[in-house]
Amino acid sequence: LPTMQQFEERQKVNLNDFGDRYGIKVPKSMVVNDLSDLAEVGKRFDYPVVVKGKYYDAGIAYNSEQVRSNFLKLSARWGVPVIIQEFIHGAEYNVTGLGDGTGETIAAVPMRKQYITDKGKAWGGISIADERMLQMTRDFVGKTKWRGGFELELMKDKQNEFYLLEINPRMPAWIYLAVGVGQNIPEAVV
């Protein structure tokens, strides 16, 4: 498992600081604790924006009313803060991997979601050989000394730049894809 420090610093509310600390590109974001904070969204971001619950769930907002509606829904369900994140136009990619806690990457499997459920979960995907994604993963593990399994959620923009959207401190539901390409990450943990 990751250390408590690793777990906390990768929280959505800390993602900008995480990106700055480790030299990883992340979308610009803003933490919102109450309705009065929402007036800043239109000043700091171009629409659309992503409105994220602190633990789970997200919506895309194309105007201030949709930001407000998403904020109310997410804060009622998950509490505050709610995170407003720059919307990155592009294609979603993911990496699952395993760090040894000393900076070494034991395993890493990049993938592209091909079929997505109504909840945004991968129903089908393909592994991809992308050296930049693998290097980004090695950098993440090396700089943070990550311990345990993880999933990196990435967005590749139109300029082919990768942005880190989220770090899940667990193996993803699609972990069997890694087994299928010869990296049995669950077995490596035990």
Model-derived features: positions:
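A short, flexible beta-alpha/helix-coil linker loop
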Residues: Y56-D57, Y115-D118, R170-A173
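Active-site nucleotide/adenylate-binding loops and adjacent lid/helix of ATP-dependent enzymes
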Residues: Q6-G90, D100-E104, E131-L134
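Short beta-strand elements of ligand-binding domains
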Residues: L1-T3
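Active-site-proximal flexible loops/turns
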Residues: V41, G59, Y93, N160, ...
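Activation loop entry of protein kinases
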Residues: L165-I167
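Active-site "cap" helix and flanking loop/linker of ATP-utilizing ligase/carboxylase catalytic domains
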Residues: I128-E153, K158, P169-V190
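Phosphate-binding site of ATP-dependent enzymes
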Residues: N63-K145, M155-Y163
